[in-house]
């Protein structure tokens, strides 16, 4: 449901407008993207190539539209686009389908001058607590991931 004109993207724009509207000095400093699991496993009839092409096309359109709408409210001339991988435990169970989507995410973010953050070795909630939730990172892994995102943000801002 992510895509220009689709419900989740409309919600993203609504929330962005709301946040920016709270104070005229509010600025967008980065675009953090951490989605794609559903795109990896839904539409079983899609080949890996179709999954890749569809996801890349949707992300490129979304990121481009977002930049066009909000470039005047960005903190810097170039808005850092940062994305991350999936939980290892979930990824291993869905590797074939996920590789196409992850490749699309990586290439799209990098084409916008952004960075892709690796998530290998980070534990899921299930691995930490045994609760069956293998798609979300546990609290400790989220802290590590946040630090990795910030390092990517700093590197982009420095032009590396």
Question: PLM features: what roles do these ranges have?
Answer:
Residues 1-160:
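Cell-envelope and extracellular/periplasmic
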């Amino acid at each position: 449901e992510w895509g220009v004109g689709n419900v989740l993207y409309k919600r993203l724009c609504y929330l962005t407008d709301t946040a920016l509207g709270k104070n005229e000095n509010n600025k967008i400093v980065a675009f953090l993207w951490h989605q794609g699991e559903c795109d990896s496993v839904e539409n079983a009839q899609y080949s890996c190539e179709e999954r890749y092409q569809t996801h890349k096309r949707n992300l490129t359109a979304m990121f481009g539209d977002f930049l066009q709408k909000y470039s005047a409210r960005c903190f810097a001339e170039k808005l850092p686009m940062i994305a991350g991988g999936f939980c290892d435990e979930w990824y291993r169970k869905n590797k074939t389908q996920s590789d196409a989507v992850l490749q699309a995410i990586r290439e799209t973010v990098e084409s916008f001058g952004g960075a892709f953050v690796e998530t290998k070795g980070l534990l899921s909630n299930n691995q930490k607590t045994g609760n069956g939730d293998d798609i979300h990172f546990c609290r400790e892994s989220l802290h590590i991931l946040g630090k990795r995102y910030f390092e990517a943000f700093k590197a982009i801002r420095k032009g590396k």
